[in-house]
Curated annotation (Swiss-Prot):
Annotated protein name in UniProt: Anamorsin homolog
Record bears the keyword Ribonucleoprotein: no
Gene Ontology molecular-function annotations: 2 iron, 2 sulfur cluster binding; 4 iron, 4 sulfur cluster binding; electron transfer activity; metal ion binding
Residues binding [4Fe-4S] cluster, per UniProt: C235, C238, C246, C249
Binding site for [2Fe-2S] cluster: C196, C205, C208, C210
Record's subunit section: Monomer.
Residue positions of motif Cx2C motif 1: 235-238
Record SUPFAM superfamilies: S-adenosyl-L-methionine-dependent methyltransferases (SSF53335)
One Gene Ontology cellular component: mitochondrial intermembrane space
Species in which this protein is naturally found: Ricinus communis (Castor bean)
Family statement: Belongs to the anamorsin family.
């Protein structure tokens, strides 16, 4: 593991014509890399005239950018930094106050936002008070990491297996008889025949259920023997025939007759004509 740290690949670029190696070593040491003095960094100067870094893709563990002048923004190189860094690699960016037009806090927020938009993770500011970087007085810095995955990489997602819940349908059924009480189980008493009101004259009640009302209705349909032997009429129209009789007339259906005379029926009155 220590050997890997000693052999870490470092790329540093700046807009100056000269960049001391000691500045790069001190910057790498701040990352906690042991044996930073033994690293062999690649240095690119006057990078403001470049549109592409002259290194292979995914070949660097650390990339350091040092910006001193306002003319060299270096923002167009963020994509190049992401290209040359290995997955999980680190980028360090240092800017002097002369290289920014706004204040320090605004410049730090703008730089952090640009790093996040370029795809870097864990962007955070650096405390330069403890750094001994030559020529970087009155400056601010920030570091970030490239994601550990490669662009275009894919992996299979594990589908969560849903366990089937066993449901016993019999447990959901309720015996209806268990909901009934002893009073509910008793059969209702059956009303005896002729249960209408008992009085001086037995007659069907209003809500008759014993059949007395039907029997009384049948009696009312035809004239009694007393009415046949001694016909009488309260309206005076019973003997004129059905055309003059009311709907409840007991003589309805009988031939016309004279009141006070005995009504006699022929022997074949109920016999069929055919």
């Amino acid at each position: 593991m220590d050997r890997t740290r000693k052999q870490c690949s470092v790329l540093a670029f700046t807009d100056d014509a000269v960049l001391p190696v000691s500045t790069i070593v001190n910057a790498v040491r701040e990352l906690g890399n042991e044996g930073a003095e033994q690293c062999d960094p690649q240095v690119v100067t006057q990078a403001s005239s470049l549109s592409k870094l002259p290194v292979d893709s995914s070949s660097m563990d650390i990339v350091i950018s040092i910006c001193r002048s306002l003319q060299f923004q270096g923002d167009f190189l963020f994509e190049e930094i992401s290209r040359v860094l290995k997955p999980g690699g680190t980028v360090l960016i240092y800017k002097t106050l002369q290289s920014v037009a706004e204040g320090t806090s605004e410049a730090v927020l703008a730089l952090e936002r640009k790093l996040l938009l370029a795809g870097f993770l864990e962007a955070q500011g650096l405390q330069l008070n403890s750094l001994e970087l030559s020529g970087l007085d009155h400056s601010f810095g920030m570091k970030a990491k490239k994601p550990s995955w490669k662009i275009g990489s894919s992996f299979a997602l594990k589908k969560s297996t849903k366990g089937s819940v066993k449901v016993n349908l019999d447990d959901d059924l309720i015996d209806e008889d268990s909901l009934l009480t002893e009073e509910d189980m008793k059969k209702p008493p059956i009303a005896p025949g002729g249960d209408c009101e008992v009085g001086s004259t037995r007659k069907a009640c209003k809500n008759c259920t014993c059949g007395r009302a039907e029997a009384e209705e049948k009696v009312k349909l035809g004239p009694t023997m007393e009415q046949l032997n001694n016909p009488q009429s309260a309206c005076g129209s019973c003997g004129l025939g059905d055309a003059f009789r009311c709907s409840t007339c007991p003589y309805k259906g009988l031939p016309p007759f004279k009141l006070g005379e005995k009504v006699s029926l022929s022997g074949n009155f109920l016999a069929a004509d055919i």
